[in-house]
Amino acid sequence: MANTETAVFGMGCFWSAEELFRHVDGVISTEVGYMGGNVKNPTYGQVCRGKSGHIEVVKVSYDSKIITYDDLLELFWKNHDPTTPNRQGWDVGEQYSSHIFYFTDEQRIVAEKSLEKMQCYMDLKIVTAIKKASDFFPAEEYHQKYFMKKNNCILNF
């Protein structure tokens, strides 16, 4: 029986983040959406225009008997730039900022220790925010499993 837990990460464009995590052994499901803002049921347009305060996130449901929260955090750190505020690559805006949203005190502690450890390897200061999870609003259907639907788009991680 699966020991299902949830993790939520903001690490730039949620399409790429979802594609990364959905291939990981122990991940049960992924869903992209919005978290951390002040508008109920925001649209992609509202988020992109900076009108909602939300972050693009990937919600990861995983079996903690197969993969740990620490393992997921390692993937998080290694697959985006946590030192650049409000930007990942070509994507610019608050919605692309680096965030870890936690559900339990245990997740918060693990995330904080992970950030401290990661900072030792970085020349620049990590700007990743670690915040208590708030309401998750699923993104529109066309954003879900985006790269899987566009099977001619392949990402290399």
From Swiss-Prot:
GO molecular function: L-methionine:thioredoxin-disulfide S-oxidoreductase activity; peptide-methionine (S)-S-oxide reductase activity
EC category name: oxidoreductase
Catalytic activity: L-methionyl-[protein] + [thioredoxin]-disulfide + H2O = L-methionyl-(S)-S-oxide-[protein] + [thioredoxin]-dithiol; [thioredoxin]-disulfide + L-methionine + H2O = L-methionine (S)-S-oxide + [thioredoxin]-dithiol
UniProt-listed GO biological process terms: protein modification process
UniProt function note: Has an important function as a repair enzyme for proteins that have been inactivated by oxidation. Catalyzes the reversible oxidation-reduction of methionine sulfoxide in proteins to methionine.
Entries under NCBIfam families matching the protein: msrA (TIGR00401)
HAMAP family: MsrA
Name of the protein in its database record: Peptide methionine sulfoxide reductase MsrA
Organism: Methanococcus maripaludis (strain C7 / ATCC BAA-1331)
Gene encoding the protein: msrA
